[in-house]
């Protein structure tokens, strides 16, 4: 039985066969450009994955997105999110472990999209994201380990180590 797995905001990362890639960028593996209006029937999607995507939207927009995505999921379907963790960044900064410059990318997320520069509009910690997910209809909210996924070999920022990708000496 084929699973419908969607990678939202994938950019250049192509997870390969068995994944649908949706992103506003212009890449060969992209099937749709609109993550705000998924072209799937309600209750038809097994997994929606969005790594470092929702922080580019206002919180009010995100609640609408999350509610829409929830309706697309099958019963027992999974929404897997990765966001910059504000509590970790602030703790590491306050501890003096890293300078502010170390966090400017994860905090503000400057990215070029077509002809525009876009930036993060909000930040999350676990509690704020959990409240938002529950308000959007998600019942089971938990953290997940990037090492235990079938996309663990991709640097998609779910492995957001500081310093970047220093898995030996860095911290999440």
Residue ranges and their predicted role:
Residues 12-42, 145-146, 151, 155-164:
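Adenosine-cofactor binding site in Rossmann-like domains, unifying the SAM/SAH pocket
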Residues 4, 18, 140:
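Residues at the starts of beta-strands that form the adenosine-phosphate
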Residues 2, 45-46:
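Local beta-strand N-terminus motif with an aromatic residue
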Residues 9, 25, 84:
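Anionic group-transfer/hydrolysis microenvironments
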Residues 52-56:
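Short catalytic micro-motifs in class I SAM-dependent methyltransferases
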Residues 59-172:
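S-adenosyl-L-methionine-dependent methyltransferase catalytic module, highlighting the catalytic core
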Residues 49:
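A conserved beta-strand element that flanks and buttresses the S-adenosyl-L-methionine
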Residues 4-11:
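Conserved class I S-adenosyl-L-methionine
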């Amino acid at each position: 039985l084929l699973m419908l797995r969607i990678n939202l905001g994938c950019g250049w990362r192509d997870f390969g066969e068995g994944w649908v890639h949706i992103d506003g960028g212009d890449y060969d593996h992209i099937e749709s450009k609109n993550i705000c209006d998924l072209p799937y029937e309600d209750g038809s999607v097994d997994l929606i994955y969005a790594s470092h995507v929702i922080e580019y939207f206002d919180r009010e927009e995100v609640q609408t997105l999350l509610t829409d995505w929830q309706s697309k999921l099958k019963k027992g379907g999974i929404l897997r999110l990765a966001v910059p963790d504000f509590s970790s960044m602030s703790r590491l900064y306050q501890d003096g472990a890293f300078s502010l410059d170390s966090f400017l990318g994860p905090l503000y997320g400057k990215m070029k999209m077509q002809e525009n520069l876009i930036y993060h509009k909000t930040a999350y910690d676990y509690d704020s994201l959990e409240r938002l997910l529950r308000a959007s209809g998600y019942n089971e909210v938990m953290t997940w380990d990037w090492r235990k996924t079938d996309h663990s070999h991709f640097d998609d920022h779910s492995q957001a180590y500081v310093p970047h990708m220093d898995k030996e000496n860095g911290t999440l």
